[in-house]
């Protein structure tokens, strides 16, 4: 709530019906979700596959975030063995990474996906606040994704900037799936998220609000043209175009 600059009273009680033409804050009191956010940590991948198969018809061995449409809840299901979560802080960080993404997606109700770079950026930001030694990377189905365990990401970002290889925000907004992420994208989305939260938390909250809870005139969820919405949000919330943001971020990142 602090990052989103929202109050518990902003969200509906889960019983009232939203009226067309009024601000939409979701379907229930849990940042817009009807039911509480859930977490299940199991000992082994076999335990996880058994649970997911019985509950949701899934057979996934690695960490899974899932929207239970019946109960209106977002859940994180993980297991210690497959994800090598053998240290307390690694478990803690991994859980926080995934729960932070669920909270972001669930803000004003999970009716559509938040852009990938913002989800991954917030997940990295929250996890690395706990211990930068341990880092989680999302992957698309059927892919192992990126698995690099460097600790000092500030130096990695500086090297990318110096080499002219740092992604621009326009490139990050165009990423449609985690399979498209290279390591430089992970570094950049983390650093840009940290930059926004550190230098303009009001702007970050404003952008998040603009992207979530969008409705068409008939009241159905509106996930169209999120690329245009993001560009408009940078102008409205940060007072910068994409090139201006890139320049400000690079200057800040080099100083870290």
Where do the protein language model's features map onto the residues?
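Juxtacatalytic substrate-recognition/specificity segment
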Residues: 1-115, 217-219, 225-232
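Acidic/His/Gly-enriched intrinsically disordered linker/tail segments
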Residues: 61-78, 90, 110-256
